[in-house]
Amino acid sequence: MEGDGVPWGSEPVSGPGPGGGGMIRELCRGFGRYRRYLGRLRQNLRETQKFFRDIKCSHNHTCLSSLTGGGGAERGPAGDVAETGLQAGQLSCISFPPKEEKYLQQIVDCLPCILILGQDCNVKCQLLNLLLGVQVLPTTKLGSEESCKLRRLRFTYGTQTRVSLALPGQYELVHTLVAHQGNWETIPEEDLEVQENNEDAAHVLAELEVTMHHALLQEVDVVVAPCQGLRPTVDVLGDLVNDFLPVITYALHKDELSERDEQELQEIRKYFSFPVFFFKVPKLGSEIIDSSTRRMESERSPLYRQLIDLGYLSSSHWNCGAPGQDTKAQSMLVEQSEKLRHLSTFSHQVLQTRLVDAAKALNLVHCHCLDIFINQAFDMQRDLQITPKRLEYTRKKENELYESLMNIANRKQEEMKDMIVETLNTMKEELLDDATNMEFKDVIVPENGEPVGTREIKCCIRQIQELIISRLNQAVANKLISSVDYLRESFVGTLERCLQSLEKSQDVSVHITSNYLKQILNAAYHVEVTFHSGSSVTRMLWEQIKQIIQRITWVSPPAITLEWKRKVAQEAIESLSASKLAKSICSQFRTRLNSSHEAFAASLRQLEAGHSGRLEKTEDLWLRVRKDHAPRLARLSLESCSLQDVLLHRKPKLGQELGRGQYGVVYLCDNWGGHFPCALKSVVPPDEKHWNDLALEFHYMRSLPKHERLVDLHGSVIDYNYGGGSSIAVLLIMERLHRDLYTGLKAGLTLETRLQIALDVVEGIRFLHSQGLVHRDIKLKNVLLDKQNRAKITDLGFCKPEAMMSGSIVGTPIHMAPELFTGKYDNSVDVYAFGILFWYICSGSVKLPEAFERCASKDHLWNNVRRGARPERLPVFDEECWQLMEACWDGDPLKRPLLGIVQPMLQGIMNRLCKSNSEQPNRGLDDST
């Protein structure tokens, strides 16, 4: 349905008006920039969602393979549970928070639009015409505001001009419009309004969609809100914000807001947080002239005061809407018609606020998950290191415990015999009295003392024996227990804690190792039980009892009297052999001990096998975290962080080149992000691996708290058109200092200054180590000096947490510790590098040590370092300084001093040499000046 005779040609229109073509160009540039950065945000979000999906799939796949028994040689409940627990604990927590994902998805799905509100429909139409620079809508033919029925209007881009009715976001209505029936210069009023006699609900809700070949509409849709009487503004905004980001303009033509206007604005502020661009439209027919001669002071404007009262404006903001330094968008009031161009500034702030908030939210998700990855890498690395040591320690301590208990069993047999004799002597009278007074069970004893049958006599004798045996058992067991109690203090506490840590990832049902340990410890406690379970001790006692019975001779069955019971007990006690009893108890103790020891060893082997499988999985996961998961997420984090920085501070301007390194070029940058002056390092990663490494290193640098001994990193920007568009570069903007230590030593530095620099470097390295980072490239050119010659460490390009180091050989050959070539090293490599650096500091020059200067190639140098080549002692060196250097560059990392020891040593050297230097010539170090 094309309109005929329309005034627009084939080229996009940008006509005259208060803002002129310049305003439209600025608006187009601003909205085009928003679309461009929104596309990058959308791409980053899409890749982030894919990353989290991949993590979830990896987690589910690994858990499934664990439960189905795949991928393991020796598997059992312990291995399954441990492996599943490993994945569940270490991967399932990495997920996209639903709230943030929904928020970000809504932002990238919403395109911007300009929404025109106003005091009445005429002034809204007038503002639309000013924006487009052409007379599209009538501004004088519409009826009064009370009777106006202006429907919602949407202006979109199209190659041809079309006017149609359509339900918002749905379908076009088949309806004949007046615009279709002939030529027109402005859209006919009948097409703009809802007819009073129209009862078709769809027709009433429909919006008039106008497509035009216009430069501004190529970048953004423009929506004119319907009149208040047809639909409340709050409802219109509510529908719009689901699919669009509105840049709200409010057209004014009166000097004050009416009560109805204030109510409308109060409702908008109550339900929405969008800023509003208030623009006072010039009266029809008036000339647009420079308003400098008639500009009203802001504090005298009634509109300004009303908008302050409504909370839209602040008294600290200038009413003409000039751009401020605030990153958040603020409402503006423009009362001079020629300043409509400030709409481009306002829209830029609205769009930038939206993008910055989204980029910040996305980067927080990235950083949070990266920190989880790094923490997990530390946990996994510690697990890989400590678990084998715990297993070996457990085996060693249990063996010591076993041998100690076995020695007790062998050594104390004679003591046990004496203990049994002593116990019998002590308890004899008590046992005889108890036997005399005991009441028999299941035996009827005549009160007149008449004899009873042989069967009853045997039953009575047996009960007397049982009384003696049970009482003796209890006494012997208690004394035996006390003889091994001290072992609980010396062995059990540490061993049990070690076992608990080894078994905490296992199911409760498989805690058998600890059970066997308890059996070893409690062997003495089970003495009483074994007496009642058919052991050799019990059999021996019953043989003695039979002999007692045989020795008791009678012609006829005796009477059960007190004397008889005492006599039976006396015979039983006297016939017991203390030596045989002690031997039997010790033998039983050793048997139980051997059994528990063997069971413990077997159980520990099973536990070790379970941990072996788990550690294999842990190492695989650790490698995936270091090589894949963390670098991939770090690159997304770098992109979201750089997007945030470029939105806030724009792309930095490159100044003169300051230097070149292996991985980038350093430029001067006069001013960026409020920092002055700056240094800018441009890095062009040649491949995916370098991209990921750079991203991880940037995350470590950005995550570090500010420290006075480290060069500040201000931000980063990704330049997608670096080198004329031939490559993509990461621009790292950092603090600029006066010079590096290499240049400083060449120029000459005093002894006190040099020693203070050494202290500063140690302080900086200690801070890095406290954050879990290893620098790996401490050297002269990576120590920068300010104008006061205080040192700061820079170039954290090789800096990594210990748990994330892959063993790659990095650094500068002269400063590289020998173990770096093996791929297995820790933060002591920085101590080694400091030792070499301290040699230069003490020498006061940049001349190479002789041992290194003779090397013809890098490989030659590396081989010499591995064989123990070190810098020579110079005549100017103080003895304590030389000893400190030698200790720092010791070939054995374990023998190098901790930096917490080095720092006070350096301070002592500085106090001694510099104080003595002020009183007398220094005997140890020359003062280079």
Curated annotation (Swiss-Prot):
Residues 652-906 form the Protein kinase domain. It is linked to Congenital anomalies of the kidney and urinary tract 1: A disorder encompassing a broad spectrum of renal and urinary tract malformations that include renal agenesis, kidney hypodysplasia, multicystic kidney dysplasia, duplex collecting system, posterior urethral valves and ureter abnormalities. Congenital anomalies of kidney and urinary tract are the commonest cause of chronic kidney disease in children. The lineage of its organism: Eukaryota, Metazoa, Chordata, Craniata, Vertebrata. Predominantly expressed in skeletal muscle and testis. Expressed in basolateral and apical membranes of all tubular epithelia. Expressed in thin ascending limb of the loop of Henle and the distal convoluted tubule. Expressed in all layers of transitional ureteric epithelium and in the ureteric smooth-muscle cells. Weakly expressed in heart, brain, placenta, kidney, pancreas, spleen, thymus, prostate, uterus, small intestine, white blood cells, stomach, spinal cord and adrenal gland. Is widely distributed in the CNS. Also detected in several tumor cell lines. Expressed in the skin. PANTHER family: DUAL SERINE/THREONINE AND TYROSINE PROTEIN KINASE, DUAL SERINE_THREONINE AND TYROSINE PROTEIN KINASE. The active site is at D777 (proton acceptor). Belongs to the protein kinase superfamily. Ser/Thr protein kinase family. Residues 189-215, 395-431 form a coiled coil. Acts as a positive regulator of ERK phosphorylation downstream of fibroblast growth factor-receptor activation. Involved in the regulation of both caspase-dependent apoptosis and caspase-independent cell death. In the skin, it plays a predominant role in suppressing caspase-dependent apoptosis in response to UV stress in a range of dermal cell types. GO terms for cellular component: anchoring junction; apical plasma membrane; basolateral plasma membrane; cytoplasm. ATP binds at L658, G659, R660, G661, Q662, Y663, G664, V665, V666, K681. One of its GO terms (molecular function) is protein serine/threonine/tyrosine kinase activity. It is found in: Cytoplasm; Cell membrane; Apical cell membrane; Basolateral cell membrane. It comes from Homo sapiens (Human). This is Dual serine/threonine and tyrosine protein kinase. GO terms for biological process: cellular response to fibroblast growth factor stimulus; negative regulation of apoptotic process; positive regulation of ERK1 and ERK2 cascade; positive regulation of fibroblast growth factor receptor signaling pathway; positive regulation of kinase activity. Its EC number is 2.7.12.1. It catalyses: L-seryl-[protein] + ATP = O-phospho-L-seryl-[protein] + ADP + H(+); L-threonyl-[protein] + ATP = O-phospho-L-threonyl-[protein] + ADP + H(+); L-tyrosyl-[protein] + ATP = O-phospho-L-tyrosyl-[protein] + ADP + H(+). Residues 1-21 are annotated as: Disordered. Keywords: ATP-binding, Cell junction, Cell membrane, Coiled coil, Cytoplasm, Disease variant, Hereditary spastic paraplegia, Kinase, Membrane, Neurodegeneration, Nucleotide-binding, Serine/threonine-protein kinase, Transferase, Tyrosine-protein kinase. Residues 1-14 have a biased composition (Low complexity). It comes from the Eukaryota.
